[in-house]
Amino acid sequence: VLIIAVLFLTASELVTADYTRDKWQYRAASLRDAMRNFRDTRTCSPAGEVCTSKSPCCTGFLCSHIGGMCHH
C-alpha cells in the first residue's frame, strides 16, 4: 500500500510540474506575440499626410521626397 501511495504522489507531482511548465511556455509565447503586434501597429500616414521617419506612409502609399507627402 505504501508503494502505491508513493507512486501516486510522484505521478501527481510530475503532472503538476508539466502543467506549470506548459503554462509558462504559453505566457512566454503570448508576451512574444504581444511585442510583435506592438511593433506592427506603428502609426502610419495616409495619402495627403506628411510622412517622416517616425511616421512613414501606410502600406500602398509612397512618400514624395519633395514636400514629404504620402501619395498613391
Curated annotation (Swiss-Prot):
<keyword id="KW-0960">Knottin</keyword>
<dbReference type="GO" id="GO:0008200">
    <property type="term" value="F:ion channel inhibitor activity"/>
</dbReference>
<dbReference type="GO" id="GO:0090729">
    <property type="term" value="F:toxin activity"/>
</dbReference>
<keyword id="KW-0800">Toxin</keyword>
<feature type="disulfide bond">
    <location>
        <begin position="57"/>
        <end position="70"/>
    </location>
</feature>
<feature type="disulfide bond">
    <location>
        <begin position="44"/>
        <end position="58"/>
    </location>
</feature>
<dbReference type="Pfam" id="PF02950">
    <property type="entry name" value="Conotoxin"/>
</dbReference>
<feature type="signal peptide">
    <location>
        <begin position="1"/>
        <end position="17"/>
    </location>
</feature>
<dbReference type="InterPro" id="IPR004214">
    <property type="entry name" value="Conotoxin"/>
</dbReference>
<dbReference type="GO" id="GO:0005576">
    <property type="term" value="C:extracellular region"/>
</dbReference>
<keyword id="KW-0732">Signal</keyword>
<feature type="propeptide">
    <location>
        <begin position="18"/>
        <end position="41"/>
    </location>
</feature>
<comment type="similarity">
    <text>Belongs to the conotoxin O1 superfamily.</text>
</comment>
<feature type="disulfide bond">
    <location>
        <begin position="51"/>
        <end position="63"/>
    </location>
</feature>
<keyword id="KW-1015">Disulfide bond</keyword>
<keyword id="KW-0964">Secreted</keyword>
<protein>
    <recommendedName>
        <fullName>Conotoxin LvVIA</fullName>
    </recommendedName>
</protein>
